[in-house]
Amino acid sequence: ERETWVSFPELKARTASVAGGLAAMGVQRGDTVAIVMPTVPEFTDVFFGVIHLGAIPVPLYPPVRLGRLDEYHARTAAMLTQAKSSVLVTDDRAGKLMGTTVTACDTPVRIVRASSLLKAAPVAAAHTQPHDIAMVQFSSGTTGEPKPVALTHAQVLANASAILDIEPDDDGFSPSGVTWLPLYHDMGLIGCIFPALLYPASLTLIPPEAFLAKPAIWLRALSRYRGVI
């Protein structure tokens, strides 16, 4: 089992570099940037890098299965078009399939690897207001086509704060989270990442595919990192 550790200062520095890379591409404040990545450290770099720039991240689920790819490409292209994203950030694994997706979009979409953005010079953080849009989240599409929902910074922080309200009010309590929920999902991102940063607390992320292949990895991580959430 391979581990990658990222500290809060490292995350801050990496997000500033991602923001610099996006700015060099011409991404501006208020633009939407699609993110199609699995559970990897670069996901949070990119997500918060987009916010750092004052742009709006749009997390979309990656092609986790090779079956039904035609349906995946069509649905993802429709979401990219609805979100009006002209830039899609991905990694090497998911990026191999994104070319087919963007060709199905109504407007041009540029694909960029997260690894290239991390090499850019950092830029200062944009000044945002509580009513500014923080992210666009798509509904699951269980009963119809996925629909975009714009969430403001105030709404996201209120949700994270409400989750933290259930934590014990004890000075000696040191929370540590362990999750295998996907980061493009609201529970993985809003339910786990945001509260961990707001508290702040350590958080161990397990790729969903690793958990599905070996569920015991979750229990081992809970024991190893003393997870209580």
Question: Where are the predicted features?
Answer:
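Conserved AMP-binding/adenylate-forming core of the ANL superfamily
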Residues: 1-48, 65-72, 127-128, 151-157
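AMP-dependent adenylate-forming
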Residues: 1-7, 134-136, 143
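A short helix-loop-beta submotif of the ANL/AMP-binding
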Residues: 19, 40-65, 73, 78-87, ...
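Structural motif
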Residues: 36-38, 89-94, 181
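Conserved pre-ATP/AMP-binding loop-to-beta segment of ANL
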Residues: 119-138, 144-145, 150, 155, ...
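Conserved AMP-binding/adenylation subdomain of ANL enzymes
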Residues: 157-176, 186-228
